[in-house]
Curated annotation (Swiss-Prot):
<dbReference type="InterPro" id="IPR020568">
    <property type="entry name" value="Ribosomal_Su5_D2-typ_SF"/>
</dbReference>
<dbReference type="InterPro" id="IPR014790">
    <property type="entry name" value="MutL_C"/>
</dbReference>
<dbReference type="InterPro" id="IPR014721">
    <property type="entry name" value="Ribsml_uS5_D2-typ_fold_subgr"/>
</dbReference>
<comment type="similarity">
    <text>Belongs to the DNA mismatch repair MutL/HexB family.</text>
</comment>
<dbReference type="InterPro" id="IPR042120">
    <property type="entry name" value="MutL_C_dimsub"/>
</dbReference>
<dbReference type="Pfam" id="PF08676">
    <property type="entry name" value="MutL_C"/>
</dbReference>
<dbReference type="GO" id="GO:0016887">
    <property type="term" value="F:ATP hydrolysis activity"/>
</dbReference>
<dbReference type="InterPro" id="IPR042121">
    <property type="entry name" value="MutL_C_regsub"/>
</dbReference>
<dbReference type="Pfam" id="PF01119">
    <property type="entry name" value="DNA_mis_repair"/>
</dbReference>
<comment type="function">
    <text>This protein is involved in the repair of mismatches in DNA. It is required for dam-dependent methyl-directed DNA mismatch repair. May act as a 'molecular matchmaker', a protein that promotes the formation of a stable complex between two or more DNA-binding proteins in an ATP-dependent manner without itself being part of a final effector complex.</text>
</comment>
<dbReference type="GO" id="GO:0140664">
    <property type="term" value="F:ATP-dependent DNA damage sensor activity"/>
</dbReference>
<dbReference type="GO" id="GO:0005524">
    <property type="term" value="F:ATP binding"/>
</dbReference>
<dbReference type="GO" id="GO:0032300">
    <property type="term" value="C:mismatch repair complex"/>
</dbReference>
<keyword id="KW-0234">DNA repair</keyword>
<dbReference type="GO" id="GO:0006298">
    <property type="term" value="P:mismatch repair"/>
</dbReference>
<dbReference type="InterPro" id="IPR036890">
    <property type="entry name" value="HATPase_C_sf"/>
</dbReference>
<dbReference type="InterPro" id="IPR014762">
    <property type="entry name" value="DNA_mismatch_repair_CS"/>
</dbReference>
Length: 611
């Protein structure tokens, strides 16, 4: 076959393959154009998830008949000139979207320029047969896309179900709406309104807060910290959830660069690192975080859909984001998720309240009580035997309680109003500490709470190089399940020595331990080494020092903490609560579960019909 020049329509269809993958891609490109046009109101109408019909209407600046004619040509744009390529502030700039969409659909554009008397429309079928005619229309633009991919039926076969395609489109609209709380959005599918968001006219922070409530939910705002960082060429703002308010997937993570939604690996890794001390690896925080950066320091032209970016100094951006999130979390470091308490209140609700008493039948005193089945909160990871801490609970000897908890408190009895977590009143099932504040009761998981306290204390010891070694009178020989675990411990022995653990290889599958951290006291060395070996084996051979420290600290803290089933005196319970009040991130254990639940008195009174 001889070399030949492709036709314009073929070129546009090829270009469409890079830019337009599904109906959501069409909606993204057209809504972004509407935003760039200065719209204050954008309406989206879909039929069959956009496969049959997509209509985007806006009240933006609009177009004249001459602008309409060239707008559907390749590489025509009002947003860019040759001298301004490194200073891009708009969503679109390549001039590819309209001709690419037109090449694979039946398109009708109707538009009226602001302050113009006349409106015009242009009709294209598969990118050809351009027809411009006068029309009747308000100021702004309306674009109708029918029979998407009719010109490329092979692409049509690759589309997913209507439900899946619709979900992708809703996600696109939500992201753009979050970035522009000043714009009103509506999304209708097959005659049903899915989204209706009113544009906000408040200050910037309150605009964003209200839009987040409308899109993500009020629960998120109640369980989130506000991020606010500013420098001459960089700023970060938004909301990120406290560690105990989390999800099983990353779907509710919204990241923006200069108001452009992105799925950037660098930012996602930074988010994960910021939470690594406070959350299980299979749980994800919720966030809506906006990075504003000088356009000359970020390249948005590295991906066909502009979903990825390239930073001039990626490490600077990464570290700045991590620090900003950690600073925001520290402002609410003692708080546990409010949804946990709400779920607990639901458990106590009496199904017979406000109902007529059933007096027609005598009470059967011999009937068996119904089984109590507690509900599971969707934000709390289920207890699983795979977590080393949970496996330890039944096998650990009595762990040493740190000196502050052991000391007797000689002061007068503590009053409920003195402290945020209140005064201890009782211990339930030798596992939960019940305390009372002025307007609530607090239920604390003693093992989870002390594990967090130990984690923070050991972490500080390691950071400040204050971890003291304790030589074992009789070195402990630990036999491991396989040679791999013994090897990985031995290969990291120098790093482990700095963390208070001295060991040597002893045969193919065994390790001999000569020193342990003094803070751990009289612990089960066999179990400590086996758990540590399991942790490191999961990470592979080339484990980084920071990750090693994380695993070691986590393992130490678990062995160090008060176990469930340990009876505590009133002084010990109060000492534990006071330590929690003075320790960062004591609202959640090392796995992201809450260490305490607070039940407000007003909610308890409502349960009994008092209010």
């Amino acid at each position: 076959m001889t070399i030949k020049l492709l036709s314009e329509s073929t070129i546009n269809r090829i270009a469409a393959g890079e830019v337009i993958e599904r109906p959501a891609s069409v909606v993204k490109e057209l809504v972004e154009n509407a935003v760039d046009a200065g719209s204050t109101k954008i309406d989206i109408i879909l039929e069959r998830a956009g496969k049959n019909l997509i209509i985007i209407s806006d009240d933006g600046v609009g177009m004249t008949d001459k602008e309409l004619e060239i707008a559907v040509e390749r590489h025509t744009t009002s947003k860019l000139d040759e001298t301004d390529f490194l200073n891009i502030h708009t969503f679109g700039f390549r001039g590819e979207a309209l001709p690419s969409i037109a090449a694979i659909s039946k398109m009708l554009i109707t538009s009226k320029k602001r302050d113009n008397q006349k409106a015009f429309q242009i009709k294209l079928i598969g990118g050809d047969e351009k027809q411009i005619a006068p029309a009747i229309h308000n100021e702004g633009t309306k674009i109708e896309i029918r029979d998407l991919f009719f010109a490329t039926p092979a692409r049509l076969k690759f589309l997913r179900t209507d439900k899946t395609e619709l979900a992708a489109t809703v996600d696109v609209v939500k992201k753009i709406a979050l970035a522009h709380p000043e714009i009103s959005f509506s999304l209708t599918h097959d005659g049903k309104t899915l989204l209706k968001l009113k544009g906000q006219n408040k200050d910037a922070e309150n605009n964003l807060k209200q839009r987040i409530i409308d899109v993500i939910g009020e629960d998120f705002i109640k369980n989130a910290s506000y991020i606010d960082f500013k420098s001459p060429d960089f700023s970060i703002y938004g909301y990120t959830s406290i560690p105990t308010y989390n999800r099983a997937s990353s779907e509710d993570q919204f990241l923006f660069i200069n108001n452009r939604p992105v799925k950037d690996k660098l930012l996602q890794v930074a988010l994960r690192v910021a939470y690594q001390d406070y959350m299980l690896r299979d749980r994800y925080p919720l966030c809506a975080i906006f990075l504003q950066i000088d356009p000359q320091l970020v390249d948005v032209n590295v991906h066909p859909a502009k979903a990825e970016v390239r930073f001039h100094d990626p490490n600077y951006v990464r570290n700045l984001l991590i620090d900003s999130i950690k600073n925001a979390l520290s402002n609410k470091s003692h708080i546990a998720s409010t949804t946990i308490a709400s779920s607990a209140i639901e458990l106590f609700k009496n199904p017979f309240v406000n109902k007529e008493p059933a007096i027609s039948k005598p009470l059967n005193v011999n009937s068996k009580p119904s089984k109590y089945r507690p509900a599971t909160s969707p934000t709390v990871p289920k207890y699983t035997p795979n977590n080393s801490c949970q496996k330890l609970i039944d096998t650990l000897p009595h762990a040493r309680i740190e000196q502050e908890v052991e000391q007797r408190i000689q002061n007068e009895p503590q009053k409920s109003s003195q402290y945020r977590l209140g005064a201890a009143k009782a211990q339930l099932h030798t596992t939960y500490v019940i305390s009372q504040t002025e307007d609530s009761i607090v239920i604390t998981d003693q093992h989870a709470a002390h594990e967090r306290l130990g984690y923070e204390k050991i972490k500080n010891y390691i950071k400040n190089e204050e971890l003291i070694k304790q030589r074992l009178l009789i070195p402990e020989i630990v036999e491991l399940p396989d040679e791999k675990r013994a090897d990985i411990l031995y290969e990291n022995k120098d790093k482990l020595s700095k963390l208070g653990l001295s060991l040597e290889k002893f045969g193919e599958k065994s390790i001999i331990v000569t020193e342990i951290p003094n803070i751990l006291g009289d612990i089960n060395v066999q179990k400590l080494i086996q758990d540590l070996a399991d942790h490191l084996a999961e990470c592979g051979e080339n484990i980084a020092l920071t990750e090693l420290i994380e695993h070691v600290t986590e393992t130490y803290a678990c062995h160090y903490s008060i176990r469930a089933g340990r009876k505590l005196s009133a002084d010990e319970m109060n000492a534990l609560l006071r330590q929690m009040e003075n320790t960062p991130f004591s609202g959640q254990c090392n796995h992201g579960r809450p260490t305490y639940i607070e039940l407000k008195l007003k909610d308890i009174e409502r349960l009994f019909g008092r209010k």
